[in-house]
Every structure is written in structure tokens, then in C-alpha cells.
Amino acid sequence: MPKYRSATTTHGRNMAGARALWRATGMTDADFGKPIIAVVNSFTQFVPGHVHLRDLGKLVAEQIEAAGGVAKEFNTIAVDDGIAMGHGGMLYSLPSRELIADSVEYMVNAHCADAMVCISNCDKITPGMLMASLRLNIPVIFVSGGPMEAGKTKLSDQIIKLDLVDAMIQGADPKVSDSQSDQVERSACPTCGSCSGMFTANSMNCLTEALGLSQPGNGSLLATHADRKQLFLNAGKRIVELTKRYYEQNDESALPRNIASKAAFENAMTLDIAMGGSTNTVLHLLAAAQEAEIDFTMSDIDKLSRKVPQLCKVAPSTQKYHMEDVHRAGGVIGILGELDRAGLLNRDVKNVLGLTLPQTLEQYDVMLTQDDSVKNMFRAGPAGIRTTQAFSQDCRWDSLDDDRANGCIRSLEHAYSKEGGLAVLYGNFAENGCIVKTAGVDDSILKFTGPAKVYESQDDAVEAILGGKVVAGDVVVIRYEGPKGGPGMQEMLYPTSFLKSMGLGKACALITDGRFSGGTSGLSIGHVSPEAASGGSIGLIEDGDLIAIDIPNRGIQLQVSDAELAARREAQEARGDKAWTPKNRERQVSFALRAYASLATSADKGAVRDKSKLGG
């Protein structure tokens, strides 16, 4: 029988000092012996996806206390990728994932907490907390802040739905008037919550459902809707049950590594491909799998991508649907239901509610359930009122979207495409693979060949795009922006958005060892591995080299002879200490970022730290 971890600090005469300090936090004699549960919050006024979380930790804590536990809340940092985008702040985004994971480990282990409720939402916060949860392997439930409502504005006598990416594209489009750009900017992000499309934050919060670590509705129920409060109340009650099951009944099925198993990771990736999730999810799932000591690699993702169809299409891949529409169609469980009926899921998995996949679908799939309260929950919709308050409205759609032929979520028979929304490509400068979000690629450019325009920083590429130096047919290559080379593996949302602003969204490709925002669409290929700073062949590409992209056949090829590449590699190595570094780039890199770079691996490993350098 496992012993409560917290007993280390609450039991025995020699722990009198620790108990004295616990008493100073409000604990009493009656609390010593109860499970101490960490409420891991991420409230900040910097991030719209987290601005409403201040009081939600207290909400969870009250339920924990009522159920017989002791709740202790702490906060992690949270970076807003959209605000950090397009300048030096983006260097800090991905490294913040490791800091978040470490900070959770530090707090939980330093104070011997028995379990956790993780209140996350945006891009690196959910992955960081997920990595920590699987590293610590104590009972955990995730409950995120929820998606933002889609923006809406009237243009050309039509009401159109908007998001952050629309504001970026129109802000740089010379054909768009100042007044229209201003109107879009003011309308794009109307409420608190994670940005309203299938961007990284919402993708990851959906994936926690598929991994079994969050409750049905977590990924899609709007931040502003009153129904979302129930997820927080349930999490506080349920975590005490899970904690007691493990520590008092020796039930290891309550632990996250037994819930988020290899089969669950495969289901999560299957969901990701089917819903056209952010390419960043590949990075984060690979990293989380390593923390769980699960053998889940790019090879597994490649195999899944070849057999899973695209059953859901959401912004940025279309302007028709946002997360509020996914929820109306049944949310994550709705997509999982269609995947299950297509025979594409592992059914022998459980979630934090203790339900198997078939049981979850029977209870929560809108195409199967007889429970009117579940159907009512999935009718929760937007109010269209600007707010930063959680649970501030109770609007509902008149009906569910259960049209699996023409609706937001499709059945296998009516799939958007037989190919899924993500693909792994391999070739002579991406030997370990690279990732493309096929959901956002126009059919006309699934095969594309063009001359390279090479840039050794995102800034130079942006200047060239906006300066008209990139023309139709070009393949923009941005290198030395990987985990080590950046450092920090910047997102390339501005270059991809500005290609659209210049009318080149369907006429150019962009390839990088950096990564892309979940808001990116178009022929945007990232995570090229190995990265240039690690000696990857992307560092050998020269201006004018032809690059052939063949998504249907999963290929990407630099059309240069092996002999020429060998000669270029020899010349690169001859640069000595300057080898595999940018030739003409000035960038101030802090000590903290240099420390990150010294241990960073390439994207095919999840951009995690190289344990071999630490003797691990």
C-alpha cells in the first residue's frame, strides 16, 4: 500500500517544524493525515486565455476541501505566443514549457503533495503541466480555461467570423483599408479564453481528453459559458476520489501513466490528425511520451497519418468553423465517436472518470447518448458580448449540429479528405522528418517544386516578404531557428501570414527548422530535423536550389547531387567554431536561453533536453 507522500511532512515528532509551518497556512490537527492536493493554476493578466483563471483555483480548492482533502494552490508562468510573436519575445515561448514542467515538479516534490489539479489553457502551459504530470506520476486531472468565442464583424454587408490570424493578415495587407483593418483588430478576440480556432492551445486541450486526463467537454466548452463551471467543480471532487483510490486502495489505474498509456497516446494522435490540429502538438506529444517513458516516436505518427482521415475542419483551415462550432457538433467526444465507428481507435483505455472509451462514448457522444443534460451541455454557445469573465453567460444553440455528412464533424463516409490533417515528410534534408499541417494546404499545391530563397532568421524573411523579394513559385527557407539554433524554436506565424497578405498564400512554400503557430495554414513545413544548428542538411541549402515537395507520397527533396552536398558539408565543417551557425545574423541571446540551447534536442525528439548530456 503506497504511503501518502504528504505524510513525510505531516507525521512524526521530528516534523514538528514542518507542521508548524503548515499550521501557519491554515491547516489544523484535523488536516494532518488528509491528502494534500496541489491546485496548479496559471492565472496571469498578460494572457487572454488565462486572465479569467484567478478565482478558479479557489473554486477547485473548495471542492477538494469539501471532499476530504487539503488544497494548496500555486501558480506557474504563462507566455502568450501571440503577444510574443514577431520579435525577440518568441525566443522564450518553447523554453517556457520546460520551465513550467520543472516548476511544477519543484513545487510538488518540495512540499510532498499527493496529487494535482492542473488549471491550464494556452500554448506551452498545458504541455508543460502534462510533462510534469507524467514525470511525477501522481493522480492528476486537467481542467483548462476554455476557448475564446469567435470574433464577429460586418464586412461587405455580411457578418463574418474572425480570429487572431485574420487581424494579422489584414494588418499587413496593403489592399485593406485602415478602417477595415482596425475593425477586424477590434473584433477578432472578443472574450477571455484560448484563441478561437484549432490552434495550439485548443488542440492540446482537446488532446488531454483523448489521453484520458480531462473530462468530456474540456477541449471545446467556451470559457465564457456557465456550463464550464461544472468541469471545475467536478475536478475538485474527483481528484480526491482518485487520490484515495491510489493511496488507500493501492489502485494504480488512478495514476496518469496508466491512464495516458501508449494506446491513449495513439488515440490522441489519431484525434489530432482527424481534427487537423496544430503541428506543435506533435512536438508536445513526443515530449510528454518521453516523460511517461512511452516509446512513441515520429515513426508512430507517420504510420497513423497514412490511415487516418480528416473528419473535422476548423479555423485556420477554414473560416466557417471555430471551437464553438466543434462543441455544438459534440466536441472531442463527437470526433472520437466517428473515429471509433471507423475502427481507428484503441478501445481498451480509461479516463479520469474511470470510464472506458465505449462507456464514454455511450454517455457523452451526441450521436449515441440518451442523456438530455449531455445534449444540453453541447448546445452551450457564444453570447457575443466582450468580457474577461469566466462563466458569464448561458446562451445555447437552438439545436445540435449532428449532420455528419455536411456539418462541422463528419463521418468516415463523408470525410473532408481521406488523408488526415497532419503528415510527416522525409527527404535528403529532413532525414529525421518534418511536419506539415495538410488540413491547411490547398489541393493545388500538395505537390510543389520551386527555387529556394534562404534566410537565416525570421526577421530577414519577413523583411523580404513584405519588401516584394519573394515571388510566386518560391520556396522560402528559414533556418537556424530550431530549438538550439534560435534558440527557442520560434513560431513563423508572421511570415506565413504575410505571404497571404501579399497574395502568395497558395503560390509559395515555406520550410523551416523552426515551428509554426497553430494559426498557420498554407504550404508551411516545419520541425525539419536535424536542425541546421545540429548539422542538419537544411544548413546546406543555397539560394536558387530547387526543392520538390510531394505531400501525397510523403517526400521532400533538395534537388542537388549527393556529391555537391558532401562538398558543401565539408566547406561548412571547415568554418571551425563558426560551423553550423548563421553567417550574417546579429541576435542578443540571454544566458537563460543559452542554457536552454546547450541541452536542446531537435524537433523529432520533441525539443526536450538531451538527458545523455546530464548522464541520464
From Swiss-Prot:
Residue intervals passing through the bilayer: none
Catalytically driven reaction(s): (2R)-2,3-dihydroxy-3-methylbutanoate = 3-methyl-2-oxobutanoate + H2O; (2R,3R)-2,3-dihydroxy-3-methylpentanoate = (S)-3-methyl-2-oxopentanoate + H2O
Keyword terms of this UniProt record: 2Fe-2S, Amino-acid biosynthesis, Branched-chain amino acid biosynthesis, Iron, Iron-sulfur, Lyase, Magnesium, Metal-binding
Protein name (database record): Dihydroxy-acid dehydratase
Lineage, broadest ranks: Bacteria, Pseudomonadati, Pseudomonadota, Gammaproteobacteria, Enterobacterales
E.C. number: 4.2.1.9
Residue positions where N6-carboxylysine is found in the record: K124
Entries under PANTHER family matching the protein: D-XYLONATE DEHYDRATASE, D-XYLONATE DEHYDRATASE YAGF-RELATED
Pathway membership, UniProt: Amino-acid biosynthesis; L-isoleucine biosynthesis; L-isoleucine from 2-oxobutanoate: step 3/4; Amino-acid biosynthesis; L-valine biosynthesis; L-valine from pyruvate: step 3/4
Residues given in the record as Mg(2+) binding sites: D81, D123, K124, E491
UniProt remark on cofactor binding: Binds 1 [2Fe-2S] cluster per subunit. This cluster acts as a Lewis acid cofactor.
